[in-house]
Amino acid sequence: GARFIRRRKVQKYIDFDRTRSHNCLFNFVNGIRGCGKTYGKLKDDIDRYMKGKGRFIYLRRSEEELKTLTTQKSGRLFNHVQTEYEGHALWCEANLLHIDKEVCGYAAALSTARKLKSDALDYVTDIIFDEYVIDDTTSQQRYLPDEVTAFFEFYETVARPGSRDYDVTVWFLGNAISSS
C-alpha cells in the first residue's frame, strides 16, 4: 500500500527557548545570513514583553546602522515580524520600540552608548547585539576602538549589577563568516 510520510513544519526562524534554557548571561548565536536570528529573537522578546517579562534593547554598533531601522519615523525593524502579531501595531521611532501604545524596548548604538542613562532604560531584561561580527571581506565597517570595554560599560549601565533582582541577558547575533 501507499505510505504517507508526515512532514514536520519547517520553522523559518530560530527558536530561542532552548538556548535560554541553558541560563547563560551571554549567548552567542551565529548562523548563515537569512536563517532567522534577528526575526526569532525579536519574536522571542516581543512575546516575553507581552507576558510581562520585561523590555529589551536592540543594539547595533553605530547610529548609522539604526537610521532606517529604528530612528526615522516608521523604522523598519519590525517589518517582517509584524505578521506574527495580528491586531497589534509594532513600530519604531526615535529609537523607541513600541507595541500598540506601549514602549516594549529601546534601540541604541554602541558607539554612543556612553551618553545613555540607566534610569531611562526601565525594566530591561534582554539585550540583542545584532550583527556583532563584521565580515571585513564585504563590509566597510570596522570595530570600534576598545569595543569590548565599551560593550561592558554599556552592559553595566543597563544591568546595574547588584541593584536589580533579575539578570540582564545578552544575545550576540552574528553571521557565520569564514576567515582565511
Question: Which functions belong to the PLM regions below?
Answer:
Residues 2-180:
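Phosphate/NTP-binding elements of NTP-utilizing enzymes
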